[in-house]
Amino acid sequence: MPAVPIRFGHARLGYRWTRYFGWSVRKLHVRGAADALAGLGHLGIRSAVDTALRPDTRSCNICGWSGSRFYPNVGPGYYEREASCPRCSCIHRYRTLAIVLGMASDFFSPEKSVIEVAPVRSFQAYCLWRKEGRNYLSFDLERFAMEPGDLTAMRYADNACDYFLCYHVLEHVPADVQALAEIFRVLRPGGTAILQVPIDWSLTDTVEYGRPNERETGHVRRYSDTGFGARIMAAGFELLKLRPSDLIDDSLIARHGLSTEPIYFARKPLSVSAARRL
């Protein structure tokens, strides 16, 4: 686990749920207010009872926490019952990502260069620990990243990195085709982009909203599985879709509260024609 523990998970979760409760009340969103209150309840009496009476059946592979249950992850348009680590607030999809990348790639090798857009603090700290503080860089419009940057107009040179991590970001980006083209550009030939977005499995085609949807945390579209895959391949990538259950035992999935959402590995071909890059 990281040498420096990631702290204040309770405080960050409480702040997030309190803000979501206030937003829901202002928007007269009854279900959202109820979900936020349920999340806050896990920080109070229920958390103390769980700690005292229940065995350690769950553990976080990011920070080393162990306990009886994970906390809910709530926000506009979603309520995930057991998702957030009580200590570091890392959610299930990043715990899953850490295991999958460790098993299926050399992403965490200190020799491999990684660029991540829109990092979360817990996973960023974990990456820096695993990579011995080397060859990891993050950027975003928000303050938690290592430097500011725009996914649709990155300042990095062509062929700059071995891996590019873009997790639950493209659904917020109006020009997602341009963003994928930029990711393709900065990856070295043979490099891989690790991508994930919320998928609506009932859709056959991606739905564009035309503007940010407040009830979906500002998403500008709803992807279908085939639609997302088609956009990745249209950018020039070779696509491998990997389900965590293909690699990880059911008992480990339960222990670490892992996500079952597929992860999209988009590989830049070793030989790339100039026309394909435009």
What positions do the PLM features span?
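Conserved N-terminal segment of class I S-adenosyl-L-methionine
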Residues: V4-A157, R243, D250-L278
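S-adenosyl-L-methionine-dependent methyltransferase catalytic module, highlighting the catalytic core
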Residues: I45-R58, I62, P174-I183, R188, ...
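Aromatic-residue hotspot detector
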Residues: S68-Y71, C161, P212, A235-F237
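Hydrophobic beta-strand segment of the Class I
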Residues: Y156, C161-L165
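Short catalytic micro-motifs in class I SAM-dependent methyltransferases
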Residues: Y167-H172
